[in-house]
Amino acid sequence: MPRSTPRASFLQNSLKKAPFAGLFRKLVTPARHSEGGGKERLYMRTLALDIGEIRVGLAVSDPAGKISTPLKVLPADVVLNHGTEFRRIVEDWEIEQLVSGLPMTMAGEEGPQAASIREKAQKIAKACGLPLFFCDERLSSREAKRILREEGLDERAMRGKVDMIAASLFLQAWLDSQM
């Protein structure tokens, strides 16, 4: 459960008394989705990690777990060492689970870097105390580059953006698979 700051507590208490308190509860209460037979599933905000040697691309889901959005690219050592900027993202976005891209071959088997990525992702998840899932990231960087080229960016301008776009692409695929 995310920690509540004094400011957040004040806002929550003030808004609970307001005429639109019901709307406020809908906005701050995690969404529930009824699956056949009345079974409800609680959605969680998810952070995707596209882990590279130099950079880690980050993407985040909406609270309902339906839409992914590119967020940021951080130096790999900041994320791997659970640096201040990464911790702030996890706390501010109230992240409840992580999804890491896993490099797969075209045959659907784990690629040569998969073991290293798996180890790094597990280290990050352990430091955050969050559950970790893996997702096939096959061709996500290539698709991210294609999207950025269509937007008119050259290779140099793409450099920092490809990783977060790729993270958003495989996070969206993972979110869709959870529905």
What positions do the PLM features span?
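Hydrophobic alpha-helical context, especially transmembrane and signal-peptide helices
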Residues: 13, 27-28, 48, 92
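Short, Lys/Arg-enriched N-terminal segments with co-localized hydrophobic residues
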Residues: 19, 33-43
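Generic early N-terminus positional signal peaking at residue ~5-7
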Residues: 6, 48-49
